[in-house]
Amino acid sequence: KKRGGRLMAPIEFQKLEGKLKSSKSTSIISSEFFSEADSTQLTNMAKRLNGFDVQIIFTWRPLPFMLASSYQQYLKYGLKKSYSEWLESIFAKPGEAKFTPSFWKRNLQGDVVARWAKTFGAENISLIAVDESKPTYLYETFANLVGIPKGILKEPVHMEMNRSLTFSEASLLLEINRTYPKDLDWDSYEIFIRKGNIKALTRSDKHDSNDEKILTPDWAIEKAAELNSQSVAKIKSLGIKVVGDLDRSDFSRIPTGLNLPVTAIPIETVARAMIGVNMDSIKRMHGRAITKEFFHRLKKIIKARLRLN
């Protein structure tokens, strides 16, 4: 909400249906936002796809591995809470998240899969338990399930780096979010902060060698592991096809502990962030600014004419 998201017009889905009907081969539709679909939306989707041979494929990682990475993504959308504050908010009442409601919509994984299984049938649902130790595992397993030749799906060769933030970098972004002027809109934040300063940091492997990773406290790992076990049990009870190790519990790989507050940021880190404005984004901003100003002026004209009448 107010962070670049928008509802798709019905015509876009009609176009998609047309493409599916005209296609003579396997079509793949993929979006991370499908995990947030509620029962009503899924029922409508099933009606629109009636007549097609639909197979649903989930990729799955244990909940404890999702905590630090999810927090970083929310930071990039303007979150103003520290990691510890955010963890306390999501675990205060699992299923509800005051500051980031989409977190549990996506990560109560047993509930997510159950909704899809109820709508499309468990026999049409598969889940791939991701194995990070095997770089090609996800691509090869997915290709096998879909029935396409191996090698078509692979890691992009020239993909831009998108590493995790260090704790100091995350602290810098948190402070920016907390002090960001309220009178500036999302477009400005996205261009200058999200796709500018912060992207400049994450697209480079350069960082202060003394900087820590974001550490997750033991209590949060334990809470997440407990909820993960519940989700795994629910997924197993659904009778869907599972590929990989759903019982993995290698949570000792997660950096744990408590980061000390950051009181100073290395000057090199600040310099890299400051030169990160994306020029392509700035070009797009011109069009947005003109559109915004046009509707602002149109609104004033309409109000003035209504007063005259």
Where are the regions that the model predicts?
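Anion-recognition interface
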Residues: 1-309
